[in-house]
C-alpha cells in the first residue's frame, strides 16, 4: 500500500526537528529549526502559523503542561514561559561534574509517560562519540547522566505498558530497546538493524500498537517497524533526502507530521533536485498514534 504525503507547512527549515502535537484535538503542531534558531507552529484545523526566535541553536522544544516550553538551547536547557521569560535549568556540567571537552549541543528529547524528560547530546563534529543520554526529573530540578559514548542521540519512545524504551543513536545504525522501570534503563539490545543504503535513523515515534515510525536522514522516507519483532511493516516516501522526525497529530491521532531539513551548516544546498527540502509534511499511515506527553515543570 502506498502512503501518500502532502505539504503541511512550506516555511523552509534549515534543520527541522522534534515535532509535537498538543492543545485542542491535538491540533497545535510545533517543531524547532535547530540552526534557524526558530520555534515554529501551525494549527491543523485553523491553519494559524506562529514562530519565535531563540538566541542559540535549539536542539529540541518540549511543551509544558502550564504553557511555554523547555528548549534545548546550546547552553541550556532553559524553561521558557508563555511571555518569553527564560529560566535556567540544570546543565550538562551540573549532571556530569565537568565541562564539555569539545563543543556539544542538545539534540532530540521526549517526555516519558511517567513524566521524566529524556534528552540527548551530540558533538557538532558528530563522528565523535562524545554525546550522552540524560534524564530530567519531572519537577525540572535534577538532571542525571544515564550513559555516554553516544554519537548522535536521537529518537526515543516507550511501550504502552511502560516496560520498554526504544532508542536511536544514529551512527549505531540500529533501533535499540531497553527495559524501563521508573526512569531507569537496563538490558540494552538491538531491535532493528539498519542496512547500508537505507539512510540514517533519526527521530522516531510509536503508535497505539507499539509499532515504531522512524525518520531516515538521507533515506527520503519514514519507515514503520513492528515494535516486537523489528520487522519493517511500512514505508512513507518523501520528495526530499533529509527526513528528520515525526509525531502523530489530529483529533484521532491518525495524521503523521514529518519534519525535514535542508541540511547542516556548510553542507551543499541543492534545492534544484529537492525544492521542498526543509518543508513539513503530513501523511495518514492508517494507524492510530499516541499523544505528545507534556512536561510538568
Model-based region annotation:
Residues 4-10, 47-53, 86-99, 141-148, ...:
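A short beta-strand motif characteristic of beta-propeller blades
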Residues 11-26, 54-73, 96-116, 146-164, ...:
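Beta-rich, blade/repeat-based domains predominating
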Residues 22-24, 29-35, 69-75, 119-127, ...:
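Conserved beta-strand positions in repeat-built beta-propeller and related beta-rich domains
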Residues 38-40, 76, 131-134, 174-176, ...:
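A short loop-to-beta-strand structural motif that recurs across blades of beta-propeller domains
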Residues 43-47, 81-85, 137-141, 179-184, ...:
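Short loop/turn segments that connect beta-strands within beta-propeller blades
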Residues 83-123, 127, 140-142:
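Asp-box/WD-like beta-propeller blade repeats and closely related beta-sheet repeat scaffolds
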Residues 174, 193-231:
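Loop/turn-rich, solvent-exposed surfaces of beta-rich toroidal or solenoidal domains
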Residues 247-297:
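Blade-level signature of beta-propeller repeat domains, shared across WD40, Kelch, NHL, RCC1
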Amino acid at each position: 500500500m502506498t502512503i501518500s504525503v502532502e505539504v503541511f507547512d512550506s516555511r523552509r527549515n534549515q534543520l527541522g526537528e522534534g515535532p509535537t502535537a498538543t492543545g485542542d484535538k491535538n491540533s497545535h503542531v510545533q517543531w524547532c529549526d535547530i540552526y534557524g534558531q526558530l520555534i515554529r507552529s501551525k494549527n491543523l484545523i485553523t491553519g494559524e502559523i506562529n514562530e519565535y526566535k531563540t538566541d542559540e541553536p535549539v536542539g529540541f522544544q518540549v511543551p509544558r503542561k502550564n504553557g511555554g516550553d523547555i528548549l534545548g538551547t546550546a547552553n541550556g536547557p532553559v524553561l521558557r514561559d508563555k511571555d518569553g521569560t527564560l529560566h535556567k535549568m540544570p546543565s550538562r556540567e551540573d549532571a556530569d561534574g565537568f565541562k564539555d571537552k569539545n563543543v556539544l549541543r542538545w539534540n532530540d528529547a521526549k517526555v516519558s509517560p511517567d513524566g521524566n524528560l529524556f534528552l540527548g547530546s551530540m558533538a557538532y563534529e558528530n563522528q565523535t562519540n562524545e554525546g550522552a543520554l540524560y534524564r530530567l526529573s519531572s519537577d525540572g530540578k535534577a538532571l542525571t547522566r544515564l550513559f555516554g559514548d553516544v554519537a548522535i542521540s536521537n529518537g526515543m519512545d516507550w511501550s504502552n505498558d511502560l516496560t520498554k524504551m526504544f532508542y536511536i543513536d544514529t551512527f549505531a545504525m540500529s533501533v535499540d530497546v531497553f527495559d524501563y522501570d521508573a526512569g531507569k534503563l537496563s538490558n540494552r539490545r538491538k531491535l532493528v538493524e539498519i542496512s547500508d543504503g537505507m539512510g540514517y535513523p533519526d527521530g522516531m515515534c510509536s503508535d497505539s500498537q507499539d509499532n515504531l515510525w522512524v525518520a531516515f536522514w538521507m533515506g527520503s522516507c519514514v519507515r514503520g517497524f513492528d515494535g516486537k519483532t523489528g520487522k519493517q511493516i511500512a514505508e512513507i516516501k518523501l520528495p526530499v533526502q533529509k527526513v528528520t522526525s515525526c509525531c502523530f497529530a489530529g483529533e484521532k491521532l491518525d495524521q503523521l507530521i514529518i519534519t525535514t531539513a535542508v541540511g547542516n551548516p556548510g553542507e551543499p544546498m541543492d534545492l534544484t533536485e529537492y525544492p521542498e527540502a526543509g518543508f513539513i509534511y503530513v501523511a495518514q499511515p492508517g494507524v492510530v498514534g499516541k499523544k505528545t506527553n507534556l512536561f510538568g515543570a
